[in-house]
């Protein structure tokens, strides 16, 4: 589907889920502003998981229903909803925004520094095995010694 159509669908979902979220942001190819979009990726931090789950159930038929990922079909479009918390927010948003190639590059850079960028969005592990507190996507690039790239610059 075209980017504008995907944004319109995201906005419909956003206004339904926002009352139950501390944060909610579109990710994936929409956030990267790609002309063509396959599905809708959303990263959120719930304030009331029970009410949020009920509202997600009302969006459409479930595809997957996990603890960290819920997938539904909303008016014929697949919607992937990723659950974050304050500790995982920035890393999960970065990973779910992509692109795949960008994520591979970031993971390789982390590995070259003796660190591990968790592909599931759980954070960055330093050489000593400790989770590094992350506040923003910009900080991830800084820790990895790389210049920050806006989402639309990530391929």
Predicted feature descriptions by range:
Residues 2-5, 50-155:
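Acidic, metal-coordinating catalytic segment for phosphate/diphosphate chemistry
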């Amino acid at each position: 589907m075209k980017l504008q159509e995907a944004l319109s669908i995201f906005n419909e979902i956003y206004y339904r889920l926002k009352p139950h979220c501390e944060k909610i942001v579109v990710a994936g190819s929409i956030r990267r502003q790609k002309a063509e979009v396959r599905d809708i990726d959303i990263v959120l931090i719930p304030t009331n998981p029970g009410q949020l789950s009920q509202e997600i159930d009302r969006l459409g038929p479930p595809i997957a229903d996990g603890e960290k990922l819920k997938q539904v079909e909303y008016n014929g479009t697949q919607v992937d909803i990723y659950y974050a918390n304050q500790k995982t927010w920035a890393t999960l948003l970065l990973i779910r925004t992509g692109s795949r190639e960008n994520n591979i590059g970031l993971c390789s850079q982390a590995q070259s520094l003796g660190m591990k960028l968790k592909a599931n969005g759980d954070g960055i592990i330093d050489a000593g095995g400790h989770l590094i507190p992350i506040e923003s996507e910009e900080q991830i690039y800084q820790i990895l010694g790389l210049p920050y790239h806006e989402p639309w610059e990530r391929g």
